Amino acid sequence: MNRFTQHLLITLMTTVLLGVLAEPAGATNGMFLTSYGAETAGRGGANIAVADRTLALNFNPAGISQLQGQHFSLNLAVLAPQLKFENGLNAETDAKGRYFPLPAFAFVRSRPGSPWSWGLGFLAQGGMGATFQNLRTPFGTRDETYSEVRFGTLTPTVAYAINPDMAIGASFNIGYADASFRFFPHTSYFNAQDPANSFFGAAMNKAGGLQTSERVGWWWRANQKFSFGAIYQTETKSKFDGGDMRINFIAHPQLGREVHYDATMDGFTFAAQAGAGMAYRPTADWVLAFDVKRYFWDHAINTVTVTGRNPDVQGAPSEVVLPFVFNWKDQWVYALGADWRLTPALTLRAGYNYGENPVPSVTLTPLFPATTEQHLSVGAGWLRGNTTYDFAIERAFNKSVTNDNPDPRINPFGPGARVDHAQWTVSFGVSWATDL
């Protein structure tokens, strides 16, 4: 790949990456993606013990010690979720169709003879979002629900090779995330007999802020056939403020209008994770990989509290507090994949990823569905000179969950509310290497 093409691709990808903050992400292992990079996507996300590409810095940072010289990767994944909702007031309703582009760029550099390698990545890490329009509400109106969570990071990474067959590594993730939602924003209902049971629709726009976490990794090649890896990433330190929230008080007898508030969101973060992997090379043309990971959602997402302060209307409540009960569960994820080098230029891949649904049925709402469990993927890589082109397609099979919780404070959509979630993901990548 010539220098002009390198600069052009980097410029284009950087532009797209900066633009990712204009689009929400959809994820399939809770709020994380099953994989990062088309090569890894093709084998179902199994990569902890392989980790021999630049985007390994987002899986197992120790893996970049296997690279010599300068290595670059550009990747674009496009997610197409398919969501349906049904409850006692609404027949089965399709979510608004949306496509979510998720770019990634990574660079790794290591001098021959040096045990040190370092890298830098820009990645769309994950998130979630759903839009349901024209829903019947319990208040005689038709309205919408909408949500989006977006999360991207800059990831500086360093690895140290203890010897040619063992390495350790560390990454620091510094990024930005924001969240928005609309919950029947055009509906306003005042209950004169029981004012406490009135309903005033709400909408929050882009409460966001800095997100930081750390990842450490270990990689060991036991012999020419077996390699092993392990990783741990801390829970993200999250901040969500600077949002704008409006409450629809049009039906309120004293206010009669929408009121805007400064919004913050607390109790929402991205889970810590731990994992281990094994790779087996029965021949020079085959790689079989298996990963097990644990996402600690139970500590990360319980009750998410949105608070509005500083109303722009005199006489409005000085503070509005909206609690959303999530109570997510810890999640086991299993990834199994294979690479087959059919020819010196062509590699074929296939993989399976199973991630337990972390969302309890009693807290599920169409605002934040993240329920898919089973994923099947296929992919291919084409080597031309010092450049590799990768492609993968993943199907997240439909997961249907019904919330029978009668408590309207937790399940405002009523017993029998059902959400179906399936998804297609297509990934494209190009990587190349140069000498120092």
Q: How should these model regions be labeled?
A:
Residues M1-L12:
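Bacterial N-terminal signal peptides that target proteins for export
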Residues I10-V20:
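Bacterial N-terminal signal peptides
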Residues V20-G26:
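Bacterial Sec-dependent signal peptides at the C-terminal "C-region" and cleavage site
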Residues G26-A41, E86-E92, Y99-L436:
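Outer-membrane beta-barrel porins/channels
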Residues M31-N47, S65-L83:
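Transmembrane beta-strand segments of Gram-negative outer membrane beta-barrel proteins
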Residues G45-R53, N90-A95:
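Asp/Glu-centered strand-loop micro-motifs enriched in Gly/Pro and often flanked by an aromatic residue
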Residues I48-Q70, F107-P115, G127:
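Outer-membrane beta-barrel pore proteins
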